[in-house]
A protein has these predicted regions:
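Divalent metal-coordination and catalytic microenvironments
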Residues: 49, 63, 73, 87, ...
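Conserved beta-strand hairpin/beta-sheet module of binuclear metal-dependent hydrolase folds
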Residues: 42-87, 185-189, 193-199
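Accessory terminal helices/loops
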Residues: 8, 18-32, 230-237, 244-312
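Active-site metal-binding motif and surrounding structural segment of the metallo-beta-lactamase
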Residues: 43, 66-70, 78-122
Length: 312
């Protein structure tokens, strides 16, 4: 998949990561570059009746209880039938809750399809607000149309945490304030030691989008990953937004990159440098060599970090 084209078309949520792990725009319908018939759903057993599903879009987590299923994220609408089939191969029990980690369409595109089957869509309230109103991407200017009522979360929370329980399984939801977006939720299944980060962290070894136009902020991204490092141990299975199953050490590497990027760009912001001046200075050149697939990715990430400090 050509990630440059995806970004220009649809304001990708993981910058130029390449391959099947790359994210699409915050809004369905997705661009017509994807041959949905060729996408396969890969299932990984995480232990204790908990599973990770990979397809096209954000990683999915499935936790099976005695009388139903908790699902975290739902990828794109055209993949719902394949995702349902993959879950049915795990368990015949109904999906009772679908938790959204944030509003971007590669994580929420399946909301309406799963809700029609009886799943209650749960999210931090800012996700509902963003989906209902539509959004604009700060880098590309791409507009996202409002989602239909059937795609909106039916159960939301505003405080810092929420608990979802099904048949002996407990999902602990925590709002990561102003991180990837303003509505990020990370989810922890303590009985399986599985942590789901959404797009506040990734394991693609590429830069991550900071959706500053919709409340994203590198400082919140750093805070979220610090929370993961506190919560995780060496045995924790980390289902990141994109990329293969991660370990605590992967989160630590991603966190270190974010901290370095923040320190360097914040210094230039404090010196009064403009966005163009910061981009021209290439303060992340050494990081770009590892974390950016190309110059466009490097520029976009620098702009996103800069604009974190310019949010109103």
């Amino acid at each position: 998949m050509n990630l440059i084209a995806l970004v220009l078309l649809a304001a990708s949520a993981v910058l130029f990561a390449g391959g099947a792990g790359a994210q699409q725009s915050p809004s369905p319908p997705p661009p017509p570059l994807i041959d949905w018939d060729k996408i396969q759903i890969k299932t990984t057993d995480l232990g204790n009746n908990t599973y990770m599903l990979e397809g096209q879009g954000g990683n999915i987590t499935v936790a099976v209880g005695t009388d139903g299923i908790i699902m975290v994220d739902g990828q794109f609408a055209p993949l719902s039938a394949k995702i349902k089939a993959a879950i049915a191969a795990i368990s015949p029990l109904p999906i009772k809750y679908l938790i959204n980690t944030h509003f971007h369409g590669d994580h929420t595109g399946g909301n309406e399809n799963f809700a029609k089957d009886g799943a209650v869509v749960v999210a931090q309230d800012n996700i509902r607000v963003r989906l209902a109103a539509g959004t604009i991407n700060g880098i590309t200017g791409a507009k996202t149309e409002p989602r239909p009522a059937g795609a909106l979360p039916k159960e939301t929370y505003i405080g810092g945490t929420k608990t979802v329980q099904v048949g002996g399984r407990t999902a602990q939801l925590t709002h990561g304030t102003n991180a990837h977006t303003d509505g990020d939720t990370w989810v922890y299944f303590a009985d399986a030691n599985v942590l789901c980060t959404g797009d506040t962290s990734n394991n693609t070894k590429r830069y991550q989008t900071i959706d500053f136009a919709n409340g994203g902020d590198i400082r919140g991204m750093i805070a979220a990953n610090e929370a993961y490092l506190r919560a995780a141990n060496d045995s924790t299975k980390v289902v990141v937004g994109h990329g293969p199953l991660a370990k605590r050490s992967d989160v630590a590497e991603f966190h270190a990159m974010l901290v370095t990027a923040r320190e360097r760009i914040e210094k230039l912001v404090n010196e009064g440098k403009s966005e163009a001046e910061v981009v021209a200075a290439r303060p992340l050149a050494d990081l770009d060599a590892k974390w950016a697939a190309n110059e466009g990715a490097a520029t976009a990430f620098t702009r996103m970090v800069y604009n974190s400090f310019k949010r109103s």
